[in-house]
A protein has these predicted regions:
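Motif- and composition-driven signal specific to adenylation
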Residues: 1-172
Length: 172
């Protein structure tokens, strides 16, 4: 992974302004591409990494308690965990400054459940293959998703280009 790819992801990225006051939860496996975001977003912006073990993360009530006790401001969840936790710990998730999720097709009702809690400050759907250094596009989600059949993949993050190509590699 090139240094510039990590910088593009977490500094002047157009979707989140991280600072020294941010406390970013590290809930992913270190081998998972999301750990690039979870580690470098706080470190390159003077913030704090809050490492949570897998046993805590898979138990909704313990996870919620840890997020609150550790005053986590930023969290990235895989879509599967996001869908599960919007049903069980939505009030805790609603307290976050940034909640990002991605990794597979997202569930509109899960986003709506969380939005009914009037939080988090920024709810961001992320898309992009691992090869783009975690994600390449983002879409901030607001109440207006209620009429949509699916969650949009959004627009490219700063310093990123996205090309739509056909099966032969030609532009669409």
């Amino acid at each position: 992974v090139a240094h510039r790819a990590v910088n593009r992801l977490v500094i002047n990225n157009g979707y989140a302004q991280f600072s020294s006051s941010d406390r970013v939860a590290w809930v992913g496996n270190p081998a998972f591409d999301a750990s690039t975001f979870e580690v470098w977003a706080p470190l390159l912006n003077g913030g704090c990494i809050i490492a949570l073990d897998a046993t805590t993360v898979i138990n909704p009530s313990n996870f919620a308690k840890s997020l609150e006790q550790q005053r986590v401001t930023t969290l990235f969840l895989t879509t599967a965990l996001f869908n599960q936790y919007t049903s069980s710990i939505a009030p805790t998730l609603a307290q976050l400054k940034y909640l990002l999720c991605g990794g597979e097709v997202s569930d509109v009702p899960s986003f709506l459940r969380l939005l009914r809690e009037e939080g988090p400050v920024r709810l961001i759907h992320c898309y992009g293959p691992t090869e783009t250094t975690t994600f390449a596009t983002v879409c901030e989600i607001a109440q207006s998703v209620g009429g949509l059949a699916s969650i949009p993949i959004g627009r490219p993050i700063a310093n990123t280009r996205v090309y739509l190509l056909d099966g032969h590699g030609g532009p669409v």
